[in-house]
């Protein structure tokens, strides 16, 4: 009867070979080790020269030489396959297979999802063999090909499925494992080659599946043997073991890999074993699982940074309010996506244009005919403004823009003719600041609604000032209050009509986004300061009306238009900065 061993640490070295302990002379060759050192240090040329000098046979073919050079990792370098984490054996010693402890210093990882309760040497039934080949021919054993036979065995699982594979990219087999683990409650263990783990993660990305979210499925990585040269160079071997253990009583092994090409194009074979022989595969899987490592956190983070798992993150829709934070988020999102044309405020602009047209219809015929001379100039200015950004078309027609600009000019002339000094001092600052901000803004065309908004308060101001001439001084003060409110309203409509992102986003550079964000912030700050300045002007005008301008209100002369307009800034400076005059 075979001896029983309670743990993996009690296995003797004789179990590694069925013929007894191996001959050390067959396992180790100093000449070949030195030849490998020459290959890592000097390349293929130095390797061939060393073989000729020592009269050794070429024990490495050209493909193996290239594979070793690709897998070699110099000290301080991170290999693409290693994922910045060493395997279980290489993380504790830096020797080339010269340290064999009788007992491990660390406890092996537990099979946390469960494992069949078979003790060592337990009877598992009579040994049976079933062979399958790909492509399936007339003389192939069994009615199924390799892939169909494997999927049929997976559906018969009741307790556990353990997979050891080099490459795993077949989506059909992965969906079968996922469905079995979710619906039937079967534990699934998957051990993959660390060098080919990225291909498995690519498949998970295509299927919109996160490996860490599966409750009854665990994925870990393994490597082959690791060789350390005297210079510190490390060579990591690959995994060529391929078997699938099912419930501890059946195992499917062979040259078949979990890829579409092996199932349809490549020639492969699959052998299904059952009975007592499965005990050896059970032991081998537990040894490999003890040497395995979880998926590297750096590799997962690199996948997240590259956007491979962005579909798993809940993205909240952006708010439609016109705020600085929303504008910044919208601009960053468009810089990272495909540039496209964005229409902002189209319907609102058309509605406001209709309202603006009804308000500006009160202009006299003389002003209207005099303003038609300026339509060509308005059109030229509009064309120059729209050409600041290539490929952009104006949002409104040329005639509408010219009409609105002329309406605003006519109302401004009415203000200069009728308004008093105090009222003019209240309306100069917002108008100047609005004009300055419009000139600074590049590549942004104001909507018709914003221009109509500029004209509407002006008409209100003209009506209030005309009525103040026929009323007392109290009515004129009310007209000045209405003018200050109208100037603030017109400035707000002009300011918030253009701070949105440009209609064409053609550059992916971050400095463009940063410059536009600073421009929007500067415009909001200027609007805030202009509002404070306008309110201060109004308060100072109300307080100083009884002392400075009482005679001007009562003895207003219609022939002193030029003198009042010339001294307008001086009056404003006296009210704001009396100590510097």
From Swiss-Prot:
Cited SUPFAM superfamilies: Phospholipase D/nuclease
Subunit text: Interacts with FBXW7; promotes FBXW7 degradation. May interact with RAF1. Interacts with KIF22; recruits KIF22 to mitotic spindle microtubules. Interacts (via C-terminus) with DYNLL1. Interacts with HMMR. Directly interacts (via DUF1669) with CSNK1A1 and CSNK1A1L.
Compositional bias (Basic and acidic residues): 369-382
UniProt PTM: Phosphorylated during mitosis.
Keywords in alphabetical order: Cell cycle, Cell division, Cytoplasm, Cytoskeleton, Mitosis, Phosphoprotein, Proto-oncogene
Keyword RNA-binding appears in the UniProt entry: no
Annotated protein name in UniProt: Protein FAM83D
Biased composition (Low complexity): 426-438, 462-488
Phosphothreonine found at: 507
Family: Belongs to the FAM83 family.
GO annotation terms (biological process): cell division; cell migration; cell population proliferation; epithelial to mesenchymal transition; metaphase chromosome alignment; positive regulation of cell cycle G1/S phase transition; protein localization to mitotic spindle; regulation of ERK1 and ERK2 cascade
Compartment(s) of residence: Cytoplasm; Cytoplasm, Cytoskeleton, Spindle; Cytoplasm, Cytoskeleton, Spindle pole
InterPro entries cross-referenced by the UniProt entry: FAM83, SACK1
Region annotation Disordered: where it falls in the sequence: 75-101, 366-401, 426-503
GO cellular component: cytoplasm; cytosol; mitotic spindle pole
Matching PANTHER family: PROTEIN FAM83A-RELATED
Domain notes: All members of the FAM83 family of proteins share a conserved N-terminal DUF1669 (domain of unknown function 1669) domain of about 300 amino acids. This domain mediates the interaction with casein kinase 1 (CK1) isoforms. Therefore, it has been proposed to rename DUF1669 the polypeptide anchor of CK1 domain.
Modified residue annotations for Phosphoserine: 296, 456
Region (DUF1669): 1-297
UniProt xrefs under Pfam families: SACK1
Described purpose of this protein according to its UniProt entry: Through the degradation of FBXW7, may act indirectly on the expression and downstream signaling of MTOR, JUN and MYC. May play also a role in cell proliferation through activation of the ERK1/ERK2 signaling cascade. May also be important for proper chromosome congression and alignment during mitosis through its interaction with KIF22.
Entry keyword ATP-binding: no
GO-annotated molecular function: microtubule binding; protein kinase binding
Biased composition regions of type Polar residues, renumbered to the chain: 88-98
Location of region: Required for interaction with KIF22 and function in chromosome congression: 338-581
